[in-house]
Swiss-Prot record:
Active site: E305
Upper lineage: Bacteria, Pseudomonadati, Pseudomonadota, Gammaproteobacteria, Alteromonadales
Record protein name field: Membrane-bound lytic murein transglycosylase F
Gene: mltF
Chain residue ranges for the region called Non-LT domain: 20-260
Enzyme Commission code(s) on record: 4.2.2.n1
PROSITE patterns with a match to the protein in the record: PROKAR_LIPOPROTEIN, TRANSGLYCOSYLASE
Annotated source species: Colwellia psychrerythraea (strain 34H / ATCC BAA-681) (Vibrio psychroerythus)
Superkingdom of the source species: Bacteria
Family note: In the N-terminal section; belongs to the bacterial solute-binding protein 3 family.
Length: 501
């Protein structure tokens, strides 16, 4: 073999090995299927991925779980707190794809590949309620801070081309929710947040107000690396086509966003104040009678019914904390609807009965929403709406599909063909949405209170440990001093004795 031939062989082998390395570093469907799991990168947050008392949750998490299940592989979430870190993990092959509510932008299209879009959002500039509302870029007079690496930066750069005075700060330390809190505390004047994320957070921070949209609506999509194989992108195209057509995406969207489209500042503030001022008196009763239910859901139902007023009364004749009819109270064995404990006991018992009446094939949380609607409008009318849904080709076991048909019970051409006739079908839709909002907000406030209690307990334990350590050290020091003093006296006595001799 000549030296030239040997050199060619070395070059060919090097190129081949390099190609193999690239093959191993890039994501491919065959590789994912072979190893039996998929790594999905995301950002911690209420729209993506978070931990609850019942396990993991989040729109992106559940959608990613659906995708992993469709491939029959294990889902392994790789969460981060930083967009920059997220992109690095994708480029280095640590994750196979990103599912984090990422906008499709011009710059990102140059660096990554995207799956089909599944949602459209707009980006809102927000400020604190009570301050002067900025209606356009020229109205911005204070500090604007956004998350580093976000699509907000790209949109701000576009705006700066026609607004040369526009300035902003980019943070690698704080996420969108933390920046919202900085707006509320007055540390900064403005920030930018996606409309879906804002809808969730305004339930917890009602003082956040919208100034204006900084862009036209943008599509959200999952992201894969530039050198990912076509097979993984093809599988994503197939997956999103399936969840679009079978109603999975619609149901998931309703679960996380369907009940928060409308925001009422006064209502939200009033509820948060009631949680702090009124609820503590009745919380033990909700916990006592909820049993297998989440007591916070029972409390949310009660707030919707009576605003936690034990003597509440409606023109329809319902009364008490859970606003029971006289007939329902008798069925539940309740003697006095105005007795707070009896009312909560009766309401809990009746709601559990509504849940039990739902067909077993209806999964949670849909069966909970159906039970709430039944609690409000009656089981018969709910079934009428489910039948209409089925006749129209919808799924009668999905709340998102039935809720759109409930208002049809007010139209003669529909209710004349039902078993139970006319009903104000819009009421249970609003009723369920309200309770879901109250429940979400109460759950968030309750979890925050628990976190603060744990933090306080840890701080107290640390303080006690430090105090105990100081006491021990002081005791040791005193003992050492006494020993030293004793030794000194003994030495003096020895010296005196020797001198006397």
């Amino acid at each position: 073999m000549t030296k030239f031939t040997s050199l060619l062989l070395v070059i060919f082998t090097t190129v081949l090995l390099s190609a193999c390395d690239k093959e191993n570093d890039s994501s491919s469907l065959s590789r994912i299927l072979a190893r039996g799991y998929i790594n999905v990168g995301t950002i911690f947050g209420p729209t993506n991925y978070y931990t609850t008392a019942n396990g993991f949750a989040g729109f992106e998490y559940e959608l990613a779980k659906q995708y992993a299940d469709s491939l029959n592989v294990e889902l392994r979430i790789v969460p981060t707190y930083s967009l920059d870190e997220l992109f690095i993990k994708l480029n280095t092959g640590e994750v196979d794809l990103l599912a984090s509510g990422l906008s499709i932008t011009d710059k990102r299209l140059q660096r990554f590949r995207f799956a089909p879009s599944y949602e459209t959002i707009s980006q809102k500039l927000v400020f604190k309620q009570g301050n002067v509302r900025p209606r356009k870029v020229a109205d911005l007079t204070g500090t604007l801070m956004v998350t580093s690496g976000s699509s907000y930066v790209e949109n701000l750069e576009k705006l700066k081309q026609t607004n040369s005075e526009l300035a902003w700060q980019e943070s690698t330390e704080f996420d969108s929710e933390e920046l919202l809190r900085k707006v509320l505390s007055g540390e900064i004047d403005y920030t930018i947040i996606d409309s879906n994320n804002l809808a969730i957070n305004r339930r917890y921070y009602p003082e956040i107000s919208i100034g204006f949209s900084i862009n036209e609506p943008e599509p959200l999509a999952w992201m894969v690396s530039e050198n990912s194989h076509d097979d993984i992108l093809a599988s994503l195209v197939e997956f999103f086509g399936t969840v679009h057509h079978d109603g999975t995406l619609l149901a998931l969207d309703d679960k996380y966003y369907g009940h928060i489209e409308q925001f009422n500042y006064v209502e939200t503030r009033t509820f948060i104040k009631a949680v702090a001022g009124t609820l503590p008196e009745y919380q033990p009763l909700f916990e006592k009678y909820a049993q297998e239910l989440d007591w916070r859901l029972l409390a949310a139902i009660s707030y919707q019914e009576s605003h936690w007023n034990p003597t509440a009364r409606s023109y329809t004749g319902v009364r008490g904390m859970m606003m029971l009819t006289l007939a329902t109270a008798k069925q539940m064995g309740i003697k006095s609807r105005l007795d707070t404990e009896q009312s909560i006991q009766g309401g809990a018992k009746y709601f559990k009965r509504m849940i039990a009446m739902m067909p077993d094939r209806i999964p949670t949380p849909d069966r909970i929403w159906f039970a709430l609607a039944s609690y409000n409008i009656g089981f018969g009318h709910l079934n009428d709406a489910r039948i209409i849904t089925q006749r129209q080709g919808g799924d009668p076991d999905r709340w998102v599909e039935v809720k759109s048909r409930l208002p049809l019970l007010q139209q003669k051409k529909y209710y004349k063909n039902t078993k139970h006739g006319y009903a104000r079908g819009e009421e249970p839709v609003q009723y369920v949405d309200n309770i879901r909002r109250y429940y979400d907000t109460l759950s968030w406030l309750d979890e925050k209170a628990k976190e603060q209690a744990i933090a306080l307990q840890l701080a107290q334990e640390k303080s006690q440990a430090l105090l105990l350590n100081d006491i021990v050290n002081d005791s040791v020091n005193e003992s050492t001093s006494e020993e030293n003093a004793t030794e000194s006296i003994l030495k003096e006595e020895e010296v005196t004795a020797e001198t006397a001799q």
